[in-house]
Amino acid sequence: MVLLETMAGKGTECGRNFDELATIMDGVENKANVGVTFDTCHALDAGYDLENDYDGVMRQLNEVIGLARVKAIHVNDSQFGLGSHKDRHANIGEGQLGIPFFTRLVNDPTMAKLPMILETKEQTSTTHRDEIALLRGLVD
């Protein structure tokens, strides 16, 4: 299976919104072998308001692409805010998305069952082990 990733929309990259991803996917002959990786930083940077309208973003994702076609999540915070088109990952809880968003994500019955790939830099004060423990601690 090939997974297309949601992109932040910097420069001329493809996949900067759900409609572009849907168009690409619709052009693939064997649709059963193509899906989406939802990148949390990229979605915010592309202009999807995950902080204040999580349900609306998920509804739009479902309407345009279909939640069943989302196969994985890149979990990361964003150094920049909504619609910045910057693509600069931040450690969990240290960026613009914040802990309330990640609490919502890891407790969303649809999204929580997907593979989540931590995509942050290890800092001297924060390790991937710390971030994984933080995310697990948010699960109800």
Model-derived features with residue positions:
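Conserved active-site loop/cleft motifs that coordinate metal ions or position small ligands
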Residues: K71-H74, K113-T120
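A short, acidic, amphipathic alpha-helical segment used as a generic capping/interface helix at domain edges
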Residues: D55-V64, Q96-T110
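Acidic/histidine-rich catalytic cores of soluble enzymes
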Residues: M1-A90
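A short, acidic, flexible beta-alpha connecting loop/helix-capping segment that sits on the rim
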Residues: Q79, I117-T126
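C-terminal accessory segment of soluble enzyme catalytic cores
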Residues: T110-K113, T124
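Acidic, His/Gly-rich catalytic cores of divalent-metal-dependent hydrolytic chemistry
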Residues: I92-E94
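C-terminal helical cap(s) of enzyme catalytic domains, especially alpha/beta-barrels
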Residues: S125-D140
